[in-house]
């Protein structure tokens, strides 16, 4: 199979608009397990109603579906061979709880990993009325079976080293419901049938429909927000992780967190199924507590 890296990187992606409502903000929080104990995230009438920072991952959703279904110049692949490898979200400005947003996207790199290819997609989401950028997403997708085309292997980044000489500074446990993926697919905008249709999940090699990786990502970020940001969304500046294994709805996600310095939190997440880690090499950058704020 011929791969033309230049054509892939030059592939044009149309900007997309997203009309965000307060209801969307609340529903997204509910899809990550928030409830009546978290009114600032689920009740639009709350005086300090706020969006969870990882709301930023939902805006490029439809664009990604369109790109995968319509195809990418310079490369051919079976969408079933595409895996979401890593996710990085940077919060650039204060998050509005409603309004029209525009997401502009581009493919920045395609790396040859031998057994597959690593596609890097960058998305900038801005508030339409002001033009102010709010979120920057970097999606890393591994496409199985199309490597070996002689391309650049990409940077040799070493995995984040989680401290082994001390226990986590905080542990967050979040039980998911058996219907978690049913809710998240509507709130998070990922309508992939793999997460709801038993027949499609079997084709994908899973016993039952699996939970969205970005739902697990959002749940882990809630742990960081609660334990190190006092549930203040404005203090979470970026969060990045690697997806290492799937989660089945109904399992409990346990996120272990270490504070490395005033602004850096390392984390990893596992489930109660067999103790395997489902998120690894997690890094969150936070704003430290200002002196005199306590």
Curated annotation (Swiss-Prot):
Family affiliation: Belongs to the short-chain dehydrogenases/reductases (SDR) family.
- The answer, when asked if RNA-binding is one of the entry's keywords, is no
Keywords, comma-separated and alphabetical: Lyase, Peroxisome
**Can the keyword Mitochondrion be found in this entry's annotation?**
no
* Any single biological process term in GO: fatty acid beta-oxidation
The MaoC-like domain covers 165-269
Q: What class of enzyme is it?
A: lyase
* Short sequence motif named Microbody targeting signal, residue ranges: 292-294
An example of a GO molecular function for this protein is: 3-hydroxyacyl-CoA dehydrogenase activity
UniProt EC number? 4.2.1.119
Query: Where's it found, cell-wise?
Result: Peroxisome
**What is the primary gene name for this protein?**
mfeB
Q: List where this protein forms a coiled coil.
A: none
InterPro entries membership: HotDog_dom_sf (IPR029069), MaoC-like_dom (IPR002539), MFE-2_N (IPR054357)
Q: Tell me what reaction this enzyme catalyses.
A: a (3R)-3-hydroxyacyl-CoA = a (2E)-enoyl-CoA + H2O
Residues bound to (3R)-3-hydroxydecanoyl-CoA are 84-85, 113, 190-195, 213, 243
What Gene Ontology cellular-component terms does the record carry? Answer: peroxisome; phagocytic vesicle
The protein's name in its UniProt record: Probable enoyl-CoA hydratase 2
